[in-house]
Amino acid sequence: MGFDAVFDPHNWALVPFHFWSLVFFAFGCIVGSFLNVCIYRMPLDLSVVSPPSHCPHCKYSIPFYLNVPLLTWLTLRGKCKNCGAPISPRYFVVELLTGLAFLACWLAFGHTAPWVALVYCLFLAGLITATFIDFEHFIIPDEITFGGAAVGFVISIFLPQLHGTNSLRESVGRSALGIAIGAGIVYAVLRLGKLLFGRQKIKLPDGAKIIFTETALCLPDSVIPYEEIFYRKTDAIVLQARTVELIDRSYCNVALRLTPEMLKLGDEKFNPEHEPHMDVVCSEIILPREAMGLGDVKFMAGIGAFIGWQGAFFSLLASSLIGSAAGIALILLRKREWSSRMPYGPYIALAAVIWIFGGKKLFDLLFQM
């Protein structure tokens, strides 16, 4: 058999369907191994290509025979072969999840639209990467959001079937509308939420003292770690202080504004890292509060490029329900602090997955009632 026969798509069709199912699962696990690299390196602005895979603890360069998806982590019992340091179970989970996602795409669309199945594999790979990065860092890199929007739009030009049509014009229009409506709706929700709920005003007893330490804000009845206050660099604690006591100086009747990168007292500005302790007397303090950020806006634009405006709209509604259910469940499980620290991107990603595997039928059913 010559190379022409090997690469002839008509011969591929003769291969049993479930053989391709195995291929998609295996290929998904391999892709999942690369996604782990992206999840670890992208938030740190490191190259995902160089250097090759290595242990994050001892920097041991991992040879190819120790870089087999799923099997390596299991056989080494989640430890580095060289130094014995533990390797996060996340590596195994991402590889398995990606393999199952690719398999699901093939089983759902392989019979009727194999190219669409391949595109959805790419789409789900992006969702998985964004989800785990958002969980760990509360950011979604622009390479995923803007990159996803660009890739989804370009694919819509060459594969109209992605949007359920054979018309190039309709496909491009649905992708563009998905980008615009996806980003537009989430941005409107973001601005409205910021306007209505973006600040939490806490009244304090007269003469109450609050303490700013290196790691937390200490109120009279609670201690709030800074990581539960500052989700983004622009978040700020604002108050009008009666007195402010620093280690080497004091202030009276001064406006105080604290962000992760700057402490402002009146017109003076300081590096917060140089002020490890601060006693403040005030009657009211305003803390930042925000459910989603611009990363979620860009993320929805990328999603809309692949699944159109209906999918983007469905994803917004479904993610709200999923987020509410998850928050209530965590509170009932006495994990209230987890519910306040859950990023919104994973809910959007899960809603988009639901759309791909049956959400459109649910959408049509709801709007036909």
Regions found by a protein language model. Give the residues of each.
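A membrane-topology feature that recognizes alpha-helical transmembrane segments
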Residues: 1-369
